[in-house]
């Protein structure tokens, strides 16, 4: 087999090679059963055991309290933008949202279709290069919930603190930084995360929701989007994306083998520090984000001359450094350095960036 490339894609993102190798080995014959996970009935004892273990491993990794349900859902985080207000926002209620970038804005736009949304805080005055402090927010007195995006994958802003909202349920999109380091789940009413960045392949979403928030769905909420229906049916009201669920479970096992999220947090801190330090010391590359708000997982950077973008990307591709092109809405470059992207990938990227700067700087 040819050497695997270093994949800096924002999502679907790199998966641990050990996970891919195990899935390859089990593809035709899972545990001697003579069939693939893709061919199993989701009601079978075999698949139920896969699903049960995946949930327990995730609970172990994040220290999820027993009064939280763990749901494996379909539709990705974008579907949650509608599903959240349908389940948690009364028709005459208000939801507070924090705008720190494109994904926060999409959540606000969708929620506004179902009720009153108060944009309690926004990074717009800072041109989305910094997160407004909570002292700048204007939270509602009676909000049904407060929603924010922990890490904006496109802009490269990330909260390094948890908002204090009292008894109001805190709802967080952690699609791109879940499992990157320890968190206190008990501070949240609900956490949701699309899988295709730090969990597994696309097609499945993890939802961690406090039990008292179940059963609040509006009458018009489709059955398939009702959190309580999903919880009551073990996330199997209909046929789930079984193979994506299985692969996510393998990633959870791999994370435990690496020492869990505490160990992963130390590795991720080293990775992001190494890359940002190089960028900051460079004369060709720059990152505009406020130092304390820089993302651990998604590192956007620009070259001093946009005309160098194409040759930079071409040279990166030749060296097996893939998917470094920034999001179409902002341009530039972006290195997504999720859990499966190890320090060797960072070192290889920096070596190339230094070489390119020597030639073009």
UniProtKB/Swiss-Prot annotation:
GO cellular component assignments: cytoplasm
CDD domains from the UniProt entry: PSAT_like (cd00611)
Modified residues (N6-(pyridoxal phosphate)lysine): 197
Ligand binding (L-glutamate): 43
Binding site for pyridoxal 5'-phosphate: 77-78, 103, 153, 173, 196, 238-239
Cysteines paired by S-S bonds: none
GO biological process: L-serine biosynthetic process; pyridoxine biosynthetic process
Class of the enzyme per the UniProt entry, highest EC level: transferase
EC number: 2.6.1.52
Cofactor binding: number and manner: Binds 1 pyridoxal phosphate per subunit.
Keywords: Amino-acid biosynthesis, Aminotransferase, Cytoplasm, Pyridoxal phosphate, Pyridoxine biosynthesis, Serine biosynthesis, Transferase
Signal peptide residues on this chain, from the entry's feature table: none
Catalytic activity field: O-phospho-L-serine + 2-oxoglutarate = 3-phosphooxypyruvate + L-glutamate; 4-(phosphooxy)-L-threonine + 2-oxoglutarate = (R)-3-hydroxy-2-oxo-4-phosphooxybutanoate + L-glutamate
Name of one Pfam family that matches: Aminotran_5
Major place of residence: cytoplasm
Cofactor(s) listed: pyridoxal 5'-phosphate
Positions of transmembrane segments: none
Family affiliation: Belongs to the class-V pyridoxal-phosphate-dependent aminotransferase family. SerC subfamily.
Quaternary structure note: Homodimer.
Task performed by this protein: Catalyzes the reversible conversion of 3-phosphohydroxypyruvate to phosphoserine and of 3-hydroxy-2-oxo-4-phosphonooxybutanoate to phosphohydroxythreonine.
HAMAP family linked to this entry: SerC_aminotrans_5
Record-linked NCBIfam families: PRK05355.1, serC_1
Protein name per Swiss-Prot or TrEMBL: Phosphoserine aminotransferase
Annotated organism of origin: Pseudomonas fluorescens (strain SBW25)
The encoding gene: serC
